[in-house]
Amino acid sequence: MDSLTTLYKNHLDTLQERTRNVLARFNLDALLIHSGELFNVFLDDHPYPFKVNPQFKAWVPVTQVPNCWLLVDGVNKPKLWFYLPVDYWHNVEPLPSAFWTEEIDIIALPKADDIGGQLPAARGNIAYIGPVPERALKLDVPADKINPKGVIDYLHFYRAYKTDYELACMREAQKTAVNGHRAAHEAFLSGMSEFDINLAYLTATGHRDTDVPYSNIVALNEHAAVLHYTRLDHRAPSEMRSFLLDAGAEYNGYAADLTRTWAADGDSDFAALIKDVNEEQLALIGTMKAGVSYIDYHIQFHQRIAKLLRRHQIVTDISEEAMVEADITGPFMPHGIGHPLGLQVHDVAGFMQDDTGTHLAAPAKYPYLRCTRVLQPRMVLTIEPGIYFIESLLVPWREGPFSKHFNWQKIEALKPFGGIRIEDNVVIHEHGVENMTRDLKLA
């Protein structure tokens, strides 16, 4: 395996090539990429946690420093103005010296407002990519060159194809997240509350709650029926039945996004259902290959859900085909099979069919699917099927012609467990699929 230094150099070559292409297409001279700024809470002097512009961290693994700027033209060495104030109130990150810094021209920026005097005087043909349009206007960037849609679409489309450097970073993020999942599982087995399980996860990963790529979902019992449950009860429930953990990690700005579900009683019906969802998830991943639409895999898993609903007698006296046709599987798995993953957890361009931004929406029957692209080598996606017992989604089925097929007694018995989700992160290769999560032996 090449060193991170070599991988990064090749990664930069790829970004430079993409930059040359997008500048030529839109007749631009350069891209000015802003890391972002701190924004204060309304009527307060405390800022919100800083979240870096993902287009900025695509170039350099600087994720915690606002007021930084990159100027790239696809030919010359990228220039990074690194914010380095004299400040005794707050910690100041030193000028970076790492595996990547030889490839970047790094200039200290002591005062954020001084960037105007550092940039080229002629800015009429430079595109600003960043979260603060007002700042770009003050720098005399024309309004039509502030986050121009065509440029953003082009950059987003090709972000789906990960470089070897990006894949290496994502594998490292996996390792960190797997450590967290193992620690959280131990905390669950010891009877901890959601709040304390989350602390165990953060300790094992070395992350603060503002460092994780998304808010950890730490759901005990019926809380697992809330897809994005983030409340974190301080008290452990009187009876531990189930635990769903959806939590990730970051490495150099790249995300991992893993989910596991455990049953307190390994001999319960719920534990058997977890086992079967896990087996079907792995079976689906085993069929994945380049050249197939992600939509197809989503539909295929609804067929697998139908099989499990019949096997576990949750839905009875109706064929699997009829179940999928009538969308009886829908209330049990109301989300998509997964999404693109990378610099962002729900990575960009999941619906984009080409580098001009052509959009293909999710099928009307499955509106929450986050990706409609044909899979290609170097794409990274999550595969995260689930079966849930969500009363608000089941209510419409309690009446009508299909109600008789629902085993309501079995469903009521399973509702206190909330639901199941199992999520791995996979890389599409030319001749197969790499399951980064299972490669680390996370059961």
Curated annotation (Swiss-Prot):
SUPFAM superfamilies the record matches: Creatinase/aminopeptidase
Source species: Cronobacter sakazakii (strain ATCC BAA-894)
Residues annotated to bind Mn(2+) 1: 257, 339, 384, 423
Stored HAMAP family: X_Pro_dipeptid
Function (record text): Splits dipeptides with a prolyl residue in the C-terminal position.
NCBIfam families: PRK13607.1
Cofactor binding annotation: Binds 2 manganese ions per subunit.
Keyword Phosphoprotein included in the entry's annotation: no
Name this polypeptide is given: Xaa-Pro dipeptidase
Reactions it catalyzes: Xaa-L-Pro dipeptide + H2O = an L-alpha-amino acid + L-proline
Coiled coil segments of this chain: none
Entry EC number(s): 3.4.13.9
PROSITE patterns associated with the record: PROLINE_PEPTIDASE
Keywords (A to Z) from UniProt: Dipeptidase, Hydrolase, Manganese, Metal-binding, Metalloprotease, Protease
Gene Ontology cellular component annotations, sorted alphabetically: cytosol
Cofactors (names): Mn(2+)
Family under the similarity heading: Belongs to the peptidase M24B family. Bacterial-type prolidase subfamily.
InterPro entries (alphabetical): Creatin/AminoP/Spt16_N, Creatinase/aminopeptidase-like, PepQ_N, Pept_M24, Peptidase_M24B_aminopep-P_CS, X-Pro_dipept-like, X_Pro_dipept
Residues that, per the record, bind Mn(2+) 2: 246, 257, 423
Gene Ontology BP term (one): proteolysis
GO molecular function, one term: proline dipeptidase activity
